[in-house]
Amino acid sequence: MKIYLVGGAVRDALLGLPVKDRDWVVVGSTPQEMLDAGYQQVGRDFPVFLHPQTHEEYALARTERKSGSGYTGFTCYAAPDVTLEDDLKRRDLTINALAQDDNGEIIDPYNGLGDLQNRLLRHVSPAFGEDPLRVLRVARFAARYAHLGFRIADETLTLMREMTHAGELEHLTPERVWKETESALTTRNPQVFFQVLRDCGALRVLFPEIDALFGVPAPARWHPEIDTGIHTLMTLSMAAMLSPQVDVRFATLCHDLGKGLTPPELWPRHHGHGPAGVKLVEQLCQRLRVPNEIRDLARLVAEFHDLIHTFPMLNPKTIVKLFDSIDAWRKPQRVEQLALTSEADVRGRTGFESADYPQGRWLREAWEVAQSVPTKAVVEAGFKGVEIREELTRRRIAAIASWKEQRCPKPD
């Protein structure tokens, strides 16, 4: 029996990155031998065991053979005669097909070290094309390591295109697509994930609402980048700088979906694109089974981001109504989330990356003013039932009117 550290732990250690999870491959052993040594078996489809002390995963070396459609249609073979090289060959990328023995020596049968040095994401073998999930995984790795200068090898991107055009991605379940997307949204450069999907044709298959934005022009006065798809990825990049929250980043990604519905004869203007985009947000989220909390914020951002841009022109009554509409009284975090997504929208434009966004400050200040109106004072004044809410609204409007007179500049 020989045990090797494999995959991501080896890769990230070589890149000088923190190692989170460690996975091990066991060569020359059997399930019974592992059980006798005190390991606990957890793999149902193939032999994976938990170490009795560390609870890290130890898998018997195995090979995989395509036996059906999609990413689950594989038959696994695990036996003492499966070599380490056999096991590593089934991995997706060469940089993930590295192993380390107990002496610290790196085993590299597929030039993963060379690709690490050259910052290349390259598939190990043609078997890559048998698993459509790998298209998403490579896009996610491209986003995860973009800041280190990694790019996808030309031959790998070609294979990803071939897989997409062959309809392989249609076998992916919504849950797996969302899981990979959510993970990509946590990276430093989530926009790279969607750009890679577009480069290989997968964006049109998995995110048609986003793909439809490319080639749709916006007024050059407000959008020097012109193309709404490019603007969308720029705003996502900006959102990633402003917030680590997946819901803020996803909502920013979806903020302009309604522009994809504008008839070409009306271009480059997109009047009413915000409310129009709400249905597309719901459609996308339902298809991918996006969690409700993330979906709800995306809907609100699509509907209200343009309103927040015009904050100096809003009357106090409209501002209070906005807080009501986003359910800020029960979910106050939404005020900050809308401020961030709206800022990402403004700064996600060519030449505006460092622009100030005072509307965000005013929105936050107005919220603090509205919040400071005490409910207790309304009740003590003798108001009852529905009168309490009506009077509370009147006082909030008055408080914001007073604040706005002093703090928020009047529109020209």
From Swiss-Prot:
Alphabetized GO MF terms: ATP binding; CCA tRNA nucleotidyltransferase activity; cyclic-nucleotide phosphodiesterase activity; magnesium ion binding; phosphatase activity; tRNA binding
GO process annotations (BP): RNA repair; tRNA 3'-terminal CCA addition
Residues annotated to bind CTP: G8, R11, R91, R137, R140
Residues bound to ATP: G8, R11, R91, R137, R140
The EC number(s) this enzyme carries: 2.7.7.72, 3.1.3.-, 3.1.4.-
PROSITE patterns listed in its UniProt record: HD
SUPFAM superfamilies named among the record's database cross-references: Nucleotidyltransferase (SSF81301), Poly A polymerase C-terminal region-like (SSF81891)
Keyword Cell division: no
Family per record: Belongs to the tRNA nucleotidyltransferase/poly(A) polymerase family. Bacterial CCA-adding enzyme type 1 subfamily.
Quaternary state and interactors: Monomer. Can also form homodimers and oligomers.
Domain notes: Comprises two domains: an N-terminal domain containing the nucleotidyltransferase activity and a C-terminal HD domain associated with both phosphodiesterase and phosphatase activities.
Functional summary from the UniProt entry: Catalyzes the addition and repair of the essential 3'-terminal CCA sequence in tRNAs without using a nucleic acid template. Adds these three nucleotides in the order of C, C, and A to the tRNA nucleotide-73, using CTP and ATP as substrates and producing inorganic pyrophosphate. tRNA 3'-terminal CCA addition is required both for tRNA processing and repair. Also involved in tRNA surveillance by mediating tandem CCA addition to generate a CCACCA at the 3' terminus of unstable tRNAs. While stable tRNAs receive only 3'-terminal CCA, unstable tRNAs are marked with CCACCA and rapidly degraded.
Protein name: Multifunctional CCA protein
Organism: Escherichia coli O139:H28 (strain E24377A / ETEC)
Gene encoding the protein: cca
